[in-house]
A protein has these predicted regions:
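Single-pass alpha-helical transmembrane signal-anchor segments
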Residues: 1-9
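N-terminal targeting/tethering segments
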Residues: 8-120
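A C-terminal, polar beta->alpha supersecondary segment
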Residues: 14, 107-111, 124-178
Length: 178
């Protein structure tokens, strides 16, 4: 038991939240936090704004809240897409969407690194794939005359979410600061 606990701690595999029984791990949350932090830091620098706001108590709390809420939304979208599409079909559609992006452009690679702090492969995996899934879901909903925002609001209210990060809670519609 101790060995398992040690593995979970050192690998980042312990859950920070559960969404309909599916864990969001500390490593997944931490990765998403770092991507968002780097992006906002880059945006603030580009606009000659003070980046210290990101490191303030309120800045950290808000970024934690926003990143966890976004990660939960991604999980809800994943869950729905896995219900309506076979894995191979979903991957084919994702690949088709991503193939429309010129990933080999020097400017694209530099932008991914400067704005997100990610290599091209990581940018594809952690930014483009979730965005493609969101677009796929949006397309499915459009055919039903529904909007993604409305659908997400409905699904979030129906989801069973448990949050284990101190200072954050689930209010039935999103992540809020306590």
């Amino acid at each position: 038991m101790l060995i398992i606990l040690m593995y979970l701690i050192f690998s980042g595999a312990w859950p920070v939240a559960l969404v309909n029984g599916h864990p969001i791990t500390f490593s997944e949350f931490g990765r998403n936090y770092n991507i968002a932090y780097h992006f906002y830091q880059s945006e603030l620098k580009i606009n000659n704004k003070d980046t210290s706001v990101l490191d303030s108590k309120d800045g950290i709390a808000e970024l934690n809240r926003a990143v966890l809420d976004s990660t939960i939304e991604n999980e809800i979208i994943n869950e729905e897409l896995n219900k309506i599409l076979k894995p191979d079909d979903l991957n084919s559609i994702i690949d088709e969407k991503i193939s429309k992006v010129d990933l080999n452009s020097d400017n694209f690679q530099k932008g991914a690194e400067l704005l997100y702090g990610l290599s091209l492969n990581d940018f594809k995996q952690f930014v483009l794939v979730p965005k493609a899934k969101e677009q796929i879901m949006q397309g499915r909903l459009f055919s039903e005359n529904r909007q993604l925002g409305d659908w997400l609001k409905e699904k979030k209210s129906q989801s069973r979410v448990v949050i284990f990060i101190p200072g954050l809670a689930w209010d039935g519609g999103g992540v809020v600061k306590k």
